[in-house]
Amino acid sequence: MDYPAQRDFVKELAVTCRKAGLGLFIYYSVGIDWHHPYFLPNTMYDPARPHYKEVPESYRFRNVEDFKHYLNYAKTQIMELCTQYGPIAGIWFDTVGGVYQYSELFNIQEIYDMIHQIQPHALVVFKTGANGNEDFITGEREMGSLAPVFKSVGLPKKVQDAADFSWESNNEKPAELNIPIQALGWAYHTSSRQRQKS
């Protein structure tokens, strides 16, 4: 283990889920990685990186070919999740905007195929869909294409069209709606307006 905690939290979660008779469903952020040196820069996809005054030296992305380093890293992690923790119920991918904009770089179907080859029973989901081949869909606060959201923040028409296509391909599949219990949205907030700490 090459991380500070020196614990395998996924293993602990997998063991606990098995003991409780629950399936292990893993969240994986393939569409944004603020730490990997070869992830897309925010000049290519605005939310891809924080807006630093100066780009950290650790960010090494220089051209599109560099992205293969990130993708190999992500595939290796996903393969590890599918092979090291016993049966998994599924993987929920996030965030989808960059995948829509650079579908040829992400090649998400290859990742889906790898998961289904290793864990044939595992469900794969990516919001309301990254390519229309998801096993079910998840909406965030509401169901529908993400195209209006992407249009409102000025993302290219290609992204909006991909969002519409994925929604149309998936909208009759089983669905799950995700709603934060916090007024301020997802994750921990220190604001006095925040009562729940989820």
Predicted regions and their residues:
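Mature catalytic domains of secreted/periplasmic carbohydrate-active enzymes
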Residues: 1-198
